[in-house]
Amino acid sequence: MTVLPKTLLLLGSGELGKEITIAAQRLGCHVIACDRYSGAPAMQVADQAEVLDMNNSEALTAIIRHHQPDVVIPEIEALAVNALAELENEGITVIPTARATAITMNRDRIRDLASAELALLTPKFAYAGSAEELKHAAEPLGWPVVVKPVMSSSGKGQSVVSNPEGLRQAWQAAMAGSRGNSPRVIVEEFLHFDLEITLLTIRQEDGSTLFCEPIGHEQIGGDYQCSWQPAELSTEQLKQAQSMALTITKNLGGVGLFGVEFFLCGNEVIFSELSPRPHDTGLVTLISQNLSEFELHLRAVLNLPIPTIQTADAAASRVILAKDNLSSISYKGVEKALSEIDTQILLFGKPNARPGRRMGVALAKGKSMEAVRSKADRAAASIQVIKG
């Protein structure tokens, strides 16, 4: 039996962490939000906040031992995972597990698990530890290729390369966008896919697994721009995606929600990536489902029941991006964005802006997917991020 409240320590306090915090507080929980800078979105609604370098093992260990939370919930990839493993051995619960957090923060480890150990279908790929190695690794894959740092987030350091002459620049971009100390890239064949999807997969304490309706999404440079739910898949495609998601999340273990990404290429379903936490493309669930991905994550973490997941006929999201470098922020056009029925705006509360930074998201639902995607696009386009 679950006894509430619980104390949750959140590692990473961005927009996803903010929604996790709100969902946790609705269940009476006490939330400590941690990040590398003060005033991060989740800190604005958390009970307590801590600013630290979460890649520093000593600092991370000290904060967790000081607060003695019931649960540690990583919300970002860049963490001192060796410290999490040590703390887990001491009896502190890490969601989903310290091992899962370590594997999924590195593209090479999650790809090796998926491809070599679990025999899931993935894009053809190779690794390179230098610009020279990258030339030899890319050639057999054919052109174009996609080059990514083994450690990065939100598409940072990712590029599409059409010929050998572009590889050195791609290597430099990958190193500039890399997190951590790994001078290594993954180079993949470029897939001419029909659709990218995220399958939100929920592992529960009793060992059962639930799935949300698939979410279609579009990215630019590896960074989410819009998403919609439910995405249109054939029965066989959905069966394949669920089977692969079940296989890899079972291997990673633990409880909570996982965002499992796939490419759809004709009849093939190809594994792409996995996040062991709520996913940015899943922000659409704040309007599309009776229980958002954040509420589902918390219910699984706290061993609370999930009787049913209901999904709207059609729902969509579109990100709101900054265009300028701004040290203080205001927003124009909110009243226009909210003038249409079944439309919502989330402004994340980030303290500053830079070109291309995600500052909010527009959400819409209705009966027709084409109509709701257009409605979300209009709402997002109405918002201007201006100097405060």
Curated annotation (Swiss-Prot):
Pathway(s) per entry: Purine metabolism; IMP biosynthesis via de novo pathway; N(2)-formyl-N(1)-(5-phospho-D-ribosyl)glycinamide from N(1)-(5-phospho-D-ribosyl)glycinamide (formate route): step 1/1
GO biological process, one term: 'de novo' IMP biosynthetic process
Binding annotation for N(1)-(5-phospho-beta-D-ribosyl)glycinamide: E15, L16, E75, D280, K350, R357, R358
rRNA processing recorded as keyword: no
Record keywords, A-Z: ATP-binding, Ligase, Magnesium, Metal-binding, Nucleotide-binding, Purine biosynthesis
Binding site for ATP: R107, K148, S153, S154, G155, K156, G157, Q158, E188, E189, F190, L191, E196
Any one Gene Ontology cellular component term annotated for this protein: cytosol
A UniProt-annotated Pfam family: ATP-grasp
Name by which UniProt lists this protein: Formate-dependent phosphoribosylglycinamide formyltransferase
